[in-house]
Amino acid sequence: MTRPSEGGRIEVICGCMYSGKTEELIRRMRQVRIARQSYRIFTPRMDTRYAEGHVASHSGSRLEAITVATMCEILAYARDVQVVAIDELHLFDDDPAEMVRGCQVLADRGARVIVAGLDLNYRAEPFPAMMHLLALAEQVDKLYAICVKCGAYATRSQRLIDGKPAPANAPTIVVGGLDMYEARCRACYEPAL
């Protein structure tokens, strides 16, 4: 946990679908609330799976959040707060370089910036903003799900279309849940062709 005297920092919570990223973000933000630190939580406009104006985990935990599309909006809302939380980083409409730059600006202002999101897309390729933040962050927590095929630790998000792995030419970002994605380990993951 960051003390105000320590200055700004970036914390990244990453992993595949169903690894508990948002659950961990919510847990940290509940601690922030108990500590009476000022904060703002942001969720991308593109994420329409749950009630607007909330970050919500697959297990049903949720906290109020501000729905935005760009880092410019986050920077405007996050003035003079101690903690900034950004869920589902990979779903923001903004240029990945702007998302990274904005996180750096917030941390340089002295904020604790907590970012959660997928590290890899369904093709097992890194999301650009997350890839850079993993290198720049003071703290990185990679979470794992359980492979639906064999029960091993899962690190991949398998996108399914009609029950079969999505082809390589499918859109990179499609918001969905259990009906569209499975958590899989390296051995059970079927590469997009």
Curated annotation (Swiss-Prot):
It is found in: Cytoplasm. One of its GO terms (biological process) is DNA biosynthetic process. Gene3D superfamilies: 3.30.60.20, P-loop containing nucleotide triphosphate hydrolases. Zn(2+) binds at C147, C150, C185, C188. It is an enzyme of class 2 (transferase). GO terms for cellular component: cytosol. It holds the Pfam family TK. It catalyses: thymidine + ATP = dTMP + ADP + H(+). Keywords: ATP-binding, Cytoplasm, DNA synthesis, Kinase, Metal-binding, Nucleotide-binding, Transferase, Zinc. The active site is at E88 (proton acceptor). ATP binds at G15, C16, M17, Y18, S19, G20, K21, T22, D87, E88, L89, H90. Its EC number is 2.7.1.21. GO terms for molecular function: ATP binding; thymidine kinase activity; zinc ion binding. Belongs to the thymidine kinase family. HAMAP family: Thymidine_kinase (MF_00124). Homotetramer. This is Thymidine kinase. It comes from Chloroflexus aggregans (strain MD-66 / DSM 9485). The gene is tdk.
